[in-house]
Amino acid sequence: MTTTPFNRLLLTGAAGGLGKVLRERLKGYAEVLRLSDISPMAPAAGPHEEVITCDLADKAAVHTLVEGVDAIIHFGGVSTEHAFEEILGPNICGVFHVYEAARKHGVKRIIFASSNHTIGFYRQDERIDAHAPRRPDSYYGLSKCYGEDVASFYFDRYGIETVSIRIGSSFPQPQNLRMLCTWLSYDDLVQLIERGLFTPGVGHTIVYGASDNRTVWWDNRHAAHLGYVPKDSSETFRAAVEAQPAPAADDPSMVYQGGAFAVAGPFN
């Protein structure tokens, strides 16, 4: 990691599953880590932390939240499939509000938590790179496609650079056969964020967030300039995962890269 940390970093979604992990892992990257979520956060702000409750759907609140930060790690929003109306505010309005606030306050680097669900309708026997047409598998995936488009637009129009991480499955360990291919360890996630923050000239880069798993569906050649070299592998957990009852061959988790998201809903 660089020896010159940021003065103030903003982490949205800090009360979420990955947000809690990153709160602990990112402390050395800035003099002050500003933490934000719509949900209460515990523990209270510690040394070199600021805790701010913020609804991403509230444009004025997001504008205030972003003031004074040097870079943004945007992990806030709904992180699973829901009705479109529930995703609209935090994921679609929210990402626009974050980028507008970044523009107004002169923030030039953002890490955007995108998702493998932007391409979830590709089949598991297909190998794709970041230039493959997107095939979202859900309203959630659709919202992440929009977020990537916002990132692209704000770079082309305003020079705000973004690394969009299409996160696979970031958990302590893979939980099923699909995750043997999509698993992203916490250490490798942090490495991706580090490379996204400190690599010069990223423009808008899309990178697939997966560890060094034996079976891979995603080709990161278009993000090679980041220098991301995953250190972990799902092979450590293969025996335990394969000991579980196997899903049917036509189960969505065995057919589509996005797994069960491809058949979630409809929501009335």
From Swiss-Prot:
Q: Which InterPro entries match?
A: Epimerase_deHydtase, NAD(P)-bd_dom_sf
Q: In which pathway does it act?
A: Carbohydrate acid metabolism; D-galacturonate degradation via prokaryotic oxidative pathway
Q: Give the active-site positions.
A: 140 (proton acceptor)
Q: Name one GO molecular function term.
A: nucleotide binding
Q: Which UniProt keywords apply?
A: NAD, Nucleotide-binding, Oxidoreductase
Q: Where does substrate bind?
A: 79, 115-117, 169, 178
Give the EC number(s) listed in the UniProt record.
1.1.1.203
Q: Does the keyword Cytoplasm apply?
A: no
Identify the residues that bind NAD(+). Answer: 17-18, 37-39, 55-56, 75-79, 144, 170
* Entry note: thermal dependence: Activity increases with increasing temperatures between 4 and 42 degrees Celsius. Activity is below 20% of the maximum after exposure at 37 degrees Celsius for 30 minutes.
Ranges in a coiled coil: none
What reactions does this protein catalyze? beta-D-galacturonate + NAD(+) = D-galactaro-1,5-lactone + NADH + H(+); beta-D-glucuronate + NAD(+) = D-glucaro-1,5-lactone + NADH + H(+)
Recount how this protein's activity depends on pH. Optimum pH is about 7.
- Protein family (similarity comment): Belongs to the NAD(P)-dependent epimerase/dehydratase family.
Protein task: Catalyzes the oxidation of beta-D-galacturonate and beta-D-glucuronate to galactarate and D-glucarate, respectively.
Assembly and binders: Homohexamer.
**Can you say what this protein is called?**
Uronate dehydrogenase
